[in-house]
Design a protein with these regions (language model features):
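C-terminal substrate-binding subdomain of Rossmann-fold SDR/epimerase-dehydratase oxidoreductases
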Residues: 1-108
Length: 108
């Protein structure tokens, strides 16, 4: 719901440039995936491949990336005057519940 509010506020503003909207909490992709698994209550495992296995599967070396991702919302805060207030985990839980509701409606 905060993403919707942020988008609505942006649309109501006079600002015309690109902005980031998201959690400012730094999180690794594996941790984000594990968070989604934990919220869902499903019995899933994360499997990463690297080294020779990655090379064999994709034909090039495994890319080296950053340790985590987060959103820098400073420009949004400056131009729109609003910022995210709920933790990433809470937003993910609400999103998962909303998705479940949509799936249940579709399956009726």
């Amino acid at each position: 719901d905060e993403c919707v509010e942020a988008t609505y506020r942006l649309m109501q503003s006079d600002f015309m440039g690109p902005v980031n909207i998201g959690s400012e909490e730094m999180i690794a992709i594996n941790d984000f995936a594990q968070m989604a698994i934990d919220i869902s209550g499903k019995d899933l495992s994360i499997y990463n491949i690297d080294g020779q296995d990655f090379l064999d599967k994709y034909g090039h070396k495994c890319p080296i990336g950053v340790n985590g991702r987060n959103s820098d919302n400073k420009l949004y805060q400056e131009k729109i005057g609003w910022s995210v207030s709920q933790p990433l985990l809470e937003g993910m839980k609400k999103t998962y519940e909303w998705i479940l509701e949509q799936v249940e409606k579709e399956n009726k």
